[in-house]
UniProtKB/Swiss-Prot annotation:
The chain crosses the membrane at residues 55-75, 79-99, 245-265, 271-291, 605-625, 633-653, 677-697. InterPro entries: ATPase_P-typ_cyto_dom_N, ATPase_P-typ_P_site, ATPase_P-typ_TM_dom_sf, ATPase_P-typ_transduc_dom_A_sf, HAD-like_sf, HAD_sf, P-type_ATPase_bsu_IA, P_typ_ATPase. It comes from Bacillus cereus (strain ZK / E33L). The lineage of its organism: Bacteria, Bacillati, Bacillota, Bacilli, Bacillales. ATP binds at D361, E365, F393, K394, A395, E396, T397, R398, M399, S400, K412. One of its GO terms (molecular function) is P-type potassium transmembrane transporter activity. This is Potassium-transporting ATPase ATP-binding subunit.
């Protein structure tokens, strides 16, 4: 006998359901508000002063005005009924409105994001420390660069700044959307704080780094809602080409009556206007601004703040990506794995001095050394180290350690740096130092040499692991024709092992901050565009030199000011996704341009026979779609020309499907889909519309 299966029902908290329902309801309301606002804006944008910024749609608007006026005048042609002019004018009006709606809808999404950011700019007060030590409470709007402010637990950080004293957990969810608080402390690369975020534990003293209107949130708001959006160079170039095409077709249409008069017949003005509108690239002309705005919007939704559309476009053209090993390719949590003594030294001696060099070292590596030594029960004098003077790690020296009171100098660091330091003090180098360092490097680890004055005791084996999926991601970049270069402070053997495991194309070992600039310039000298990530002040020059510099929001103010993109999630690997978004923007613009121009082929076969068949009967052979009548053919072509714009708005906003592949493969794929599709779709669309229109004519 089978036992009945008892299914336990998982109970969900009703309050959680209500929260989710409220969020969904708010999202729907926001979308509805954006659409309603876009509809109003599409009418407001009919102002000729606004329309002239888009020459293609401005020509369509002029066509609407001409045909609208003609609809109230006697027809010059007996073959054109009175309702034709008003019908053409209405179709042209809706063509312009659809184009305006596409742009307004894209702008509306940006303004919605700006409104949510403005909510985080509450009227807060700051505890300012005066020069005499007194604490005065002032409004955040009165703060100026250089003011020193104390922020306690539960208080809002009043403006952008850098921590100069203390350590605290900060809730940055208002900016990044990430609920987990982050640690901010004085010194290092994680001292930068953003106005509008909240201290959730402890207390910090910060120095203000921005004046009112110049804060990070202010910049975000102005970028996403700025009405005067600067067009990118590629957008300007494409707009110039499309405007030139429009001008050429305008000249053709204006001179056409001279040709027809010679043949002994006249073409009605409304028909000429219809011909012009169908010939010029109205589809891409109506969607061009929306594509650019939507591209910026996609980057922002990815929690990346782009300082300009140019930066997003540049990301799409990137040829080389410079990546830090630690934190980007690997997890960056290098932990002490084992100790290797050299010469006649013992593991206890290596552990003792390794621990002493790490007592004051608050880095994850330093802490891991202490934990390893304690786990192995190796004794060391902690008090001796605490009384000494800490020597912090620097990118230039690539060593850290402590100077004890009795004059003893203890160091741990990169092999070549410590060897050079020992030799400078007259010490000799044990023969097996390099041998054991090579062994660690070949294993993919990082060797740190431990030395006291002029004597080397041994090595610390630090082990790091490559993030899963990195090899596949780099392979995708390779398929796109993008070269990856890994920069690391590790020695060449360690760098080579990690590079091989991760699958990067090239690596630069023992890399210092100034070396990154040299790598970037070398690539740029070859005519390539370069992207890189960084978070420290020492990364700022390289971020400024790169064509796309992605700074981490957790990094220093100098790094964020030098970069042209800021990752609010502080995830260095996101540079790969940013490149993908940039490429998607360029591909969407190119694909819809191809589709728009290819559309003209079908329109030729609709309008040309309709215009000339009565005078030149042989033209009937071009009526391959077998359209009902000349008037139906013209109206069907115009209607398709208008309707295709709103149908393509979702594609313009979302972007075309993007798959990593070579430029030639992408070109072939898009020509097939949007080139051939741009020819076939209008034939089908115009014929269907003609059948419907034919029922009413």
């Amino acid at each position: 006998m089978m036992r009945p299966v008892v299914v336990k029902e998982k109970r969900v908290n009703e309050s959680q359901i209500h929260v989710v329902e409220d969020e969904v309801r708010q999202a729907k309301t926001m979308d509805r508000d954006i659409v309603t606002h876009a509809m109003k804006q599409s009418i407001a944008k009919l102002n000729p002063k606004v329309m002239i910024k888009n020459p293609i749609m401005f020509v369509v608007e002029i066509g609407f005005i001409i045909t609208f006026i003609l609809s109230f005048l006697p027809s010059s042609s007996s073959s054109i009924p009175g309702w034709f002019n008003i019908t053409v004018s209405l179709i042209l009006l809706f063509t312009v409105l659809f184009a305006n709606f596409a742009e307004a809808l894209a702008e509306g999404r940006g303004k919605a994001q700006a409104d949510s950011l403005k909510q985080s700019k509450k009227d807060v007060f700051a505890n300012v420390v005066k020069e005499n030590g007194d604490i005065v409470q002032v409004s955040a709007t009165d703060l100026r660069k250089g003011d020193v402010v104390i922020v306690k637990q539960g208080e809002m950080i009043p403006s952008d700044g850098e921590v100069i004293k203390g350590l605290a957990s900060v809730d940055e969810s208002a900016i990044t959307g990430e609920s987990a608080p982050v640690i901010k402390e004085a010194g290092g690369d994680f001292c930068s704080v953003t106005g509008g975020t909240m201290v959730v534990s402890d207390e910090i003293t910060i120095v203000i780094t921005s004046n009112p209107g110049e804060s990070f949130i202010d910049k975000m708001i102005s970028l996403v809602e700025g009405a005067a959006r600067q067009k990118t160079p590629n957008e300007i170039a494409l707009n110039t080409v499309l405007t030139s095409l429009t001008l050429i077709f305008l000249i053709v249409v204006v001179t056409l009556p001279i040709f027809t008069n010679y043949l002994g017949f006249q073409i009605d003005t409304a028909v000429l206007v219809a011909l012009l509108v169908c010939l010029i690239p109205t589809t891409i002309g109506g969607l061009l601004s929306a594509i650019g705005i939507a591209g910026m919007d996609r980057v922002t939704k990815f929690n990346v703040l782009a300082m300009s559309g140019k930066a997003v476009e540049a990301a799409g053209d990137i040829n080389t990506i410079i990546l830090d090993k630690t934190g980007t390719i690997t997890f960056g949590n290098r932990m002490a794995h084992t100790l290797l003594p050299v010469g006649n030294e013992t593991i206890e001696q290596v552990g003792k001095w390794a621990a002493i060099s790490s007592v004051l070292d608050e880095t994850p590596e330093g802490r891991s050394v202490i934990e390893y030594v304690q786990a192995k029960s190796i004794s060391y004098n902690r008090e001796l180290a605490e009384q000494g003077e800490f020597v912090p790690f620097k990118a230039e020296t690539r060593m850290s350690g402590v100077d004890l009171r009795d004059g003893t100098k203890v160091r741990k660091g990169a092999v070549s740096s410590v060897i050079e330091w020992v030799q400078s003090q007259g010490g000799t180098i044990p023969k097996d130092v390099n041998q054991k360092a090579d062994f660690i490097s070949k294993e993919g680890g990082t060797p740190l040499v431990v030395a006291v004055n002029d004597h080397i005791y041994g090595l610390i084996y630090l082990k790091d692991t490559v993030k899963p999926g990195m090899r596949e991601r780099f392979e995708q970049l390779r398929q796109m024709g993008i070269k990856t270069v890994m920069c690391t402070g590790d020695n060449p053997l360690t760098a080579a092992t990690i590079a091989k495991e991760a699958g990067v194309d090239e690596f630069v070992a023992e890399c210092k901050p100034e070396d990154k600039i040299a790598v970037i310039k070398a690539e740029q000298d070859k005519g390539k565009l370069v992207a890189m990530t960084g978070d420290g002040t020492n990364d700022a020059p390289a971020l400024a030199q790169a064509d796309v510099g992605l700074a981490m929001n957790s990094g220093t103010t100098a790094a964020k000011e030098a970069a042209n993109m800021i990752d609010l999630d502080s995830n260095p690997t996101k540079i790969i996704e940013v490149v993908g978004i940039g490429k998607q923007l360029l591909m969407t613009r190119g694909a819809l341009t191809t589709f728009s121009i290819a559309n003209d082929v079908a329109k030729y076969f609709a309008i040309i026979p309709a215009m000339f068949t009565l005078a030149i009967p042989q033209m009937e052979a071009l009526n391959i779609m077998k359209l009902t009548s000349p008037l139906s053919a013209i109206l069907s072509a115009l209607l398709f020309n208008a309707v295709i714009i709103p149908l393509l708005i979702p594609l313009a906003m979302k972007g075309i499907a993007y798959k990593p592949m070579s430029s030639n493969a992408l070109l072939g794929r898009n020509l097939l889909i949007y080139g051939l599709g741009g020819v076939i779709v209008p034939f089908i669309g115009i014929k269907v519309i003609d059948i419907i229109v034919g029922l009413f004519i």
